[in-house]
Amino acid sequence: MTSVNEHSLLINNNENNDNNNNHINQRNNKNNINNRNNIGVNNNNNNNNNNNNNNINNNNNNNNNNNNNNNNNNNSNTGKIYLRKKKKWNFRKKILPMIVILIITAIVVCLVVFSLPFDSSNTIYNQSPFVIKEDDNLLELAMKSRQNLLNIHGNQTISKLDFAILVSNPIGYWQLATFNGKNNSNPQQTLFLPLLAAAVNWCMNQNNDPHCLQTAAGPMMNDMSSIHAGILMDIITDAPNQEFQTSNSTGFQSWLTKRESIELFLNSFNLLGNQTIINKFYPSNSGPTATWGEGLIQKLMGDNQMCPYDSALLMLNLVKSGILSEGQSYMTDLISRQTFSTFTSIGFGLPPGTTLHSVLGTSSSTKDLNEIAHLVLPNGGEMIFSIFSNGYENFGHAPYQSSILGNFAGDLIRSLGIDIGCPNKIVMTSQDKNCTVTGAPWTLDTSIQAYNNSFLYISGGVTPTSTVTWSFTINVTGLYEVCVWFPNGDLHTSVSYKVEPGDGMIYYFPVDQVHYGARWIRLDSFFIVAGNQPIISLSNRGIDPSKTVVADSVKLTRWPSSKGIPGFSNDFVIAESPE
């Protein structure tokens, strides 16, 4: 676990530079650059030495002239001896001022040194424009939320959850908590975030608008297209795949240097760390797998590698204009996401009306589930999550294959109290007095996956047909999001939730209760007038006798409202980005 430092800290330029230089200097083609730099340094040192020698010779000549003058004076004053009177040190005029100056200097030095943030290794951190402080309480609560998720879903669903979390503090800094924050993993499609930043940087260096590569960048981010990601990499590196046979082939080293331009760009802002960002994401525009030069790179450098900590810093710099400020609006537009969508995982734990910027990376074969996300809650609370996990669940029923991290995010937000001031929510369990059963009785059972550790169930085919009904009373008119919660179960089946908002309309929503339990499943959002009593119900009608129906909890959450517009949040209006 990452040690937490009581001192405030800024991002470690010195440590990052060492790590970044070690990473970049692994490339053989950098040796020539280093040699040229060394030659330049040696030339400068030689020039300085020559200048110093000249100065010494001049001083010696001056001393000789002074000695000659003194000898002449002595000769002209032959026979006369003058005794020089020894001066006394005056304490008030000489010694006391020197002591005062020394004391003032010592005080200034101490103030400067102790005002600098240090890490546990006494390394000074300094990266403008963000002040970041490791926070004990944030780490403790994040670890509890992490453990809760692992306990509920077990090792079969998820066993890895590395994270870096940043929370905006109202007094002007970011709180930080990390767990395995520097551990590298295959980023999958989260690679597209640094690739997008490099594309905007390329456009600006060409004196073009930041969105000059939108034709490729748009499909890459909107459709997660690896083909367009490959096209984009070829353009900004000016190094499309070539038919090199070995790393000693003519031209390979110069081609490799071009391919490293994305890493060099990140390194220039101290955002690379020990990450490897040089390979395409396959299948790509150059083939289904890495071949020729791209194959050689993959053998030499290994797979792409990213970590939660440096990924979180990249997202922070992009959305808060730490770098590429002219392209900030364009980039945030491209990565704006809806909660409960295929483009996010933590979004399944966020209240409606949340502003979400996110890049998601998944793999069916390795179960990788990675997300780099920035969010602003309806109350203005702001956070950055960078999570690398193995919680991808390939059971179909989009968008819930990637939904598991929503529990972690939602639990942590509630624990921190960051959601205080957001629109109200109502959670009703099967044990609430306003949850009623009509027909045959349901059986009460317990499970760690149940919302409040208890739930009701009934088999299909039981007569008479039985229904569980959750009845709500609405006191504030508005747009309400309706979600349901239930535990997993192999004997469960697909059911149909019935929603009656109170306006005379009836809606049915099929939900698979076999998979994707122990999380909030959104049915839809409904406009409900104050005084109405919306009803959500679940029945065993038409269910196979060998299967069971589970009734657990229902949640209604009101969307934010502004200027009389239901669902409108002030954060929906994008402020002018800084120049």
From Swiss-Prot:
Annotated region (Required for targeting to the plasma membrane), positions in chain: 1-75
Gene inactivation effect: Cells are 5-fold more resistant to the antitumor agent cisplatin than are wild-type cells.
Glycoprotein among keywords: no
Residues exposed to the Lumenal side: 1-94
Pfam families, per the entry: Golvesin_C (PF25275)
Residue span of region Disordered: 1-79
Entry keyword set: Endosome, Golgi apparatus, Membrane, Signal-anchor, Transmembrane, Transmembrane helix, Vacuole
Entry GO terms, CC: contractile vacuolar membrane; contractile vacuole; endoplasmic reticulum membrane; endosome membrane; Golgi apparatus; Golgi membrane
Topology in membrane: Single-pass type III membrane protein
All ranges on the Cytoplasmic side of the membrane: 116-578
Name this protein carries in UniProt: Golvesin
Lineage: Eukaryota, Amoebozoa, Evosea, Eumycetozoa, Dictyostelia
